[in-house]
Swiss-Prot record:
Part of a SCF (ASK-cullin-F-box) protein ligase complex. Interacts with SKP1A/ASK1. It comes from Arabidopsis thaliana. It comes from the Eukaryota. Residues 9-55 form the F-box domain. This is F-box/kelch-repeat protein SKIP30. Kelch repeats lie at residues 57-109, 110-167, 168-215, 243-293, 296-351. The gene is SKIP30.
Amino acid sequence: MCYRQETMSGLLDGIPEAVALRCLAHVPLHLHPNLELVSRSWRAAIRSHELFRVRKELRSSEHLLCVCAFDPENIWQVYSPNCDRWLTLPLLPSRIRHLAHFGAVTTAGMLFVLGGGSDAVSPVTGDHDGTFATDQVWSYDFVQRQWTPRASMLVPRAMFACCVLQGKIVVAGGFTTCRKSISGAEMYDPENDVWTSIPDLHQTHNSACSGLVVNGKVHVLHKGLSTVQVLESVKLGWDVKDYGWPQGPMVVVEDVLYVMSHGLVFKQEGDTWKMVASASEFKRRIGMAMTSLSDEVLIVGGVIGPDRLNWDIKPLSDVDALTVGNDRPAWRSVAPMTRCRGTILGCTQLTI
C-alpha cells in the first residue's frame, strides 16, 4: 500500500489520487505511452492494474482487435476502432520460427497464444521446420506490456479448437506431435496458471477444427463436416449435434451467429438463415480472417491467389467492416494493418 501511494502520489496537483485515476481512465490505450513520459507517478499509474480496474468500473474499457499474420513472423498488432489505428506489440519471444496453427484468445484482460507449430521453410532445402505441434502457452499483459510464458498444455497440439468459457480457456481436438488427430480436451485457469483434463470429444476427424462460443456453449467444428460437438459445462461433457449450418467462416456478433458462404453473409434467426449482405468481393481472398469487433463483422488480411491472367500472389493488409446492426448493412474500409499482411494466423477480440 505504501509503495503504491509513493509511486502514484501527486498525479494531478491538488486532486486526490482516486479522482486523478478516474480522469486517466478515460484516456485511450494508444495514448498511454505518451502519458508515461509526463512523470514517474504517471508511468506508475498507467502501468497499474488499478487503472484498468477503474476503466472497467467507469465503463471506459475499449474493444480492440488482436491480429497475427504470416508476415512478419511472430508479430502481433492491435486495432483500436476509436482512433482507427494499429499498434504493434513486442515480438513474441517464442523459440519457434514462424509460429502457426496455434490458438489465440483473450481473457482476464490478456492475450493468450497457445500451442501451434512452425511454418518456417528452409531457403536451402525447402523443407519445413520439424516442430509440428507444441504445448507452449504465452500471455501478453497489456498493463505491463510484456510477454510471459505460462503453464504448458497437458498435450502438444496444433490446428485445434480454442475458446473462452466463463473466463477459462478450453482447448480441444487438433493434431499432436506425430500429426495424429486427437480427441483430448483440457481447460486452463488463468488466475491459478493451471491446466486440467476435461472430457474428450466424442469424435475425432482427420481435419483441422475450430471453436466458437454460441449462447454460452463451446462449439467445435471440423472442416467439411456438418456435425458440431457442443460443451455447455465440464460436468455434462460433449454432445454431438447436426444443426445443418452452412459451410464457411463463422463469427458471433452480440450473441448472434453469422456465416459467410457462397459470397454472401447470413445471419442465424432461429432455425433459418437470413441473408444480410453480399461478400462477393472477398471470393478471391485466401487465408483471410472473419472476426467480430463490437457490433461489426470484420474481414482481415489474406492473400489474393493466382488466376489465369496473373500468377502472382498478393498479400493483403486490408481490413473491411460490416455494421450488422444497421437496417442496410454495407461494407466500409477501415485502417489497414501497418505491419502485418498476408494469411491471418491468429485473430481475437480484446476488451480492456
